[in-house]
Amino acid sequence: MQRVVFPNKILPYLLVAPQIVLTIVFFFWPASQALYQSVIREDPFGLKSGFVGFANFSAVLSEANYLNSLKVTVIFSVLTALLAMGVALLLATAADRVVRGKTFYRTLLIWPYAVAPAVAGMLWLFMFNPAMGTFAYMLRRNGFHWDPLLNGNHAMILIVVAAAWKQISYNFLFFVAGLQAIPKSLIEAAAIDGARGTRRFWTIIFPLLAPTTFFLLVVNTVYAFFDTFGIIHSVTGGGPARATETLVYKVYNDGFVNLNLGSSAAQSVILMAIVIGLTAFQFRFVEKRVHYG
């Protein structure tokens, strides 16, 4: 391997300086502020503050609303990840078999990823709006009373569908890349041995997609935890009756709406610990490679 030699010793540091500055400004500084705010308590006007240690964490972990948000987040994350990955794998498998127009279909399937989360949420809200939504009208015609504004289960279904639709394109790209990396000789050998399409998929293709699937499982879980705020805020606002209030949305409610900065900061630190744990878990196990032979 040829070693890269820079003409100036300062040049490498200058090249990485913008990224270092961005990391300090947008990660280390906010993280340090969250850690500081999580161990102090301020008065409602922000004039006085005092050190309280882990009292904010103790109050958060014993709060019924926080435990409810944790349950909602787990349910929402599992459903979103399974739906987004399942549909993406189905579409990737179908697109991989297309001979003519393959690039065109793949481009169409990638478009939803470019849609902003709030826009994606409003799109699905309009379609399932109880008063004027097309899909809501179809459900009523079939005797199903759809009302995500009052029914918590309906609201959960709506944000899961919207969040999964937004993430399908991302998963689709990785699954297509994983399918293309599988040696065709293995599939052809299985076909010669008499294995049908479904059996070839479950015994050969899907096991070889294990690294990609595991990687996407972690990514989709992190996505559902942290990147769906815009969808929830635009569709349900955490309601009805906190039925869709995830951990991230509760941080927003406590910090920016109720101005309880100590509790909000403690929740942020807990979320930061969760994402660090998920990332470490991913780096620990995703390095396992599949060897073709």
UniProtKB/Swiss-Prot annotation:
What is said about its interaction partners and assembly? The complex is composed of two ATP-binding proteins (UgpC), two transmembrane proteins (UgpA and UgpE) and a solute-binding protein (UgpB).
Name the membrane topology term. Multi-pass membrane protein
- Family annotation (NCBIfam families): PRK10561.1 (NF007852)
Organism whose genome encodes this protein: Rhizobium meliloti (strain 1021) (Ensifer meliloti)
An example of a Gene Ontology cellular component annotation for this protein is: plasma membrane
Which CDD domains does the protein's record reference? TM_PBP2
Main localization of the protein? membrane
Give the protein's biological function: Part of the ABC transporter complex UgpBAEC involved in sn-glycerol-3-phosphate (G3P) import. Probably responsible for the translocation of the substrate across the membrane.
What are the residue boundaries of the ABC transmembrane type-1 domain, all occurrences included? 66-282
Q: What does the sequence similarity comment in the record state about its family? A: Belongs to the binding-protein-dependent transport system permease family.
InterPro entries from the xrefs?
MetI-like, MetI-like_sf, UgpAE/MalFG_permease
**Alphabetized PANTHER family for the sequence:** BLL4140 PROTEIN, SN-GLYCEROL-3-PHOSPHATE TRANSPORT SYSTEM PERMEASE PROTEIN UGPA
Q: Which UniProt keywords apply?
A: Cell inner membrane, Cell membrane, Membrane, Plasmid, Transmembrane, Transmembrane helix, Transport
Location(s) in or outside the cell: Cell inner membrane
Report TM segments. 10-30, 72-92, 108-128, 156-176, 204-224, 261-281
- What GO biological process, any one, is recorded here? transmembrane transport
According to UniProt, the name of this protein is sn-glycerol-3-phosphate transport system permease protein UgpA
